[in-house]
Amino acid sequence: MHHDPNPFDEGADDNPFSNGGGGGARRGGGGGGGGGGGGGKSQFSFGFGGLGGGSKGGATVDIPLDNMSDSKGKGKELLQWEADLKRREADIRRREEALKSAGVPMEEKNWPPFFPIIHHDIANEIPANAQKLQYLAFASWLGIVLCLFWNFIAVIVCWIRGGDSKLFFLATIYGMLGMPLSYLMWYRPLYRAMRTDSAFSFGWFFLCYMLHIAFCVFAAIAPPVIFRGKSLTGILAAIDTFSDHAIVGIFYFVGFALFCLETLVSIWVLQKVYMYFRGHK
């Protein structure tokens, strides 16, 4: 007698809960794990087998490990850079201590007090018998700084009142070059000469300081050589501008007085330094 197949009977291949299906799931999981080892890449693979068995329904999740290794490498580089920086700082401190122990003076910037840009310590570095003279020379340097600054202000007033714009640029050049050059060319050599008793420094000071006095005399006169002399607040420029604009003329007359005073003080300083040099030698 022929029996029809049971319609409610499921085949072994179609039953997801049969042993074959479980094996398929295990095979799918194993296939997913094996995929992570190929290609030589640093990654972690985790496979999920499909419910229907086999690797068709499997999903593989790859977790790259390169980011972890990169972060560790950067951390090592930062630590190495920090150690190198500390080593350099320690080396600098060791050299400074060695120079101090050897008696080499360490010049720290201390002037002006509100924004130190130069080293200046007459009370501790200049001999007591030369400190008064050094202070006088320092006043002479501050005097030329004041003269050039006032000259800049007066020329700006003249420019506003209708003067040539080139006067402004010339006054700016006088100020920007005259202030630092006067310090480097004659005041600093005199400071070094007083401190170290160097004949060469004294000679350099005398040469440059005479040029400084010549410039002060030229500025006090302001001959009509460049732009009728109005780029400097001398007597001739003051008379010329006063006839046109009284306010501008007053500014120029004040500048003329400052240059005259600076000339007289500079001649006095030159005489005093020369007498000190001759008497000291």
Swiss-Prot record:
The keyword Ribonucleoprotein does not apply. Residues 19-49 have a biased composition (Gly residues). GO terms for biological process: protein transport. InterPro entries: SCAMP. It is a multi-pass membrane protein. Residues 1-139, 271-281 are cytoplasmic. Residues 76-102 form a coiled coil. It holds the Pfam family SCAMP. It is found in: Cell membrane; Cytoplasmic vesicle, Secretory vesicle membrane. Residues 1-49 are annotated as: Disordered. It comes from the Eukaryota. The keyword Glycoprotein does not apply. The chain crosses the membrane at residues 140-160, 167-187, 202-222, 250-270. GO terms for cellular component: plasma membrane; recycling endosome membrane; trans-Golgi network membrane; transport vesicle membrane. Keywords: Cell membrane, Coiled coil, Cytoplasmic vesicle, Membrane, Transmembrane, Transmembrane helix, Transport. Belongs to the SCAMP family. Probably involved in membrane trafficking. This is Secretory carrier-associated membrane protein 5. The lineage of its organism: Eukaryota, Viridiplantae, Streptophyta, Embryophyta, Tracheophyta.
